[in-house]
Amino acid sequence: MKNIIKTIVAGGFIVGMTALISSCVGEKFHVEGTIGNAQDSVLYFEHNGLTGFTTVDSVKLDEKGAFSFAGDKIDNPEFYRLRIAEQIINIAIDSTETVKVTAKYPQMATEYDVNGSYENEKIKELALKQINLQTQCQALYNHQPEVADSIVEVLVQTYKEDVALNYIYKEPMKAYSYFALFQFIVVNNAARLIFNPAKDAKDNKVFGAVATSWDTFYPHSERGQNLHNITIKGMRDDRIA
């Protein structure tokens, strides 16, 4: 159980540098914009690969807060983040697009605008939903600890039904659907996966839908293979149980 959770958490927000190295030379994507109220803060542009986070670039912001980062295009969607301290904006890249972000520190994680990318508009929606779920759960544990566990279960199930129906199953080939698979909340100082194929056969079917779709649209990608490994492990565990 611990091994699959580590694999899942790493897989979502964590493809290796091999894919980056093999990307098309010369073709670039761009992430640019402004972060207000962040003078002298260091803005990091980080790649979120299967094996962890790596810093692609960084910049010390001036009073205007302007930034511009670029990276090599690869053949499947990849995930990055803009970060100042603990404030994070998740970004998906699936082409040589230019993604424009405007935000204001220190609320950049929740109050930002992203333009030029349908995928990233959806990722913002999902990120805000996740933050709202986390806030509700934390409030329950703070103020109603005696009933928190049961109510949190209902909230999580409702969240999963909404996201699976209105996001993942609608467009399982999209980067935002992959992103949704690996969302989590923190309960009692421990990360809890929202979709957990190691514990719930229905969740494993959701993973399987994205894995199958990525096989079709992004054959031989490391992320697609990782999804398959997780799904197969979940099926085996379910049969054993």
Please annotate each region the language model reported.
Residues 19-23:
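C-terminal motif of bacterial Sec signal peptides marking the signal peptidase cleavage site
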Residues 166-171, 217-220:
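Flexible helix-coil transition and linker loops at the boundaries of alpha-helical arrays
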Residues 24-167:
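A non-transmembrane, solvent-exposed segment enriched in polar/low-complexity residues
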Residues 198-241:
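N-proximal helix/coil linker or "cap" segments that precede and/or mark the start of modular domains
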Residues 146-151, 190-202:
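Short coil/turn connectors between adjacent alpha-helices in alpha-solenoid helical repeat scaffolds
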Residues 131, 135, 172-193:
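Amphipathic alpha-helical repeat scaffolds of TPR domains
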Residues 1-13:
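Bacterial N-terminal signal peptides that target proteins for export
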